[in-house]
Amino acid sequence: MFIITGKKFTTLGNQIFEFMSGLYPNLTEVDIEVIPTDLTEDNVFGWTLENNDQNEIEIHNELSQKDFITTLIHELIHVDQNVRGLRDDTQRENEAYSLEHTLTNQFLNKC
C-alpha cells in the first residue's frame, strides 16, 4: 500500500509510485507511507525509515515539483534496497544517487 499524507503532491506522488513499481516490483511488497514534513533543520530533502515490512518516507514539505520527483524516486530506491536487504550505507547512497536523475528524466518524459 502506498499512501501520501499531504495534499500538495498526492497525484504526482501516486504517478511516481506507479512508474517506480514498474521498474522495482519489490515496492508493491511493502507498505509505504510518504509524510511531508519540515526537514529544514535536518538539512535533507528526505529520508526513509524501515520498520519490518513498513517503510516511512519523510520528505521536505517545501520542495519544488522537480525536487519532489527526484527525492521521492531516490527514497523509493532505498525502499527497494530495504526489501533486497542491502544495508551498506555507501552502496545504498551510491546506487540511489547514480539512478535518481536518469529515472527522474525518464519519468518526466513519460508525462
Tell where the protein language model's regions lie, with residue ranges.
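Catalytic glutamate of the conserved HExxH
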Residues: 71, 75-79, 83
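Short pre-active-site segment immediately N-terminal to the catalytic Zn-binding motif
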Residues: 53-72, 86-88
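Post-HExxH zinc-binding segment in Zn-dependent metallohydrolases
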Residues: 88-111
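Zn2+-dependent metallopeptidase catalytic core
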Residues: 7-29
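Hydrophobic (often cysteine-bearing) scaffold residues that line and stabilize catalytic clefts
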Residues: 12, 69, 73, 92
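Acidic/histidine-rich, surface-exposed loop or edge segments in extracytoplasmic proteins
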Residues: 1-4
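Catalytic zinc-binding patch centered on the HExxH motif and its immediate surroundings
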Residues: 34-56
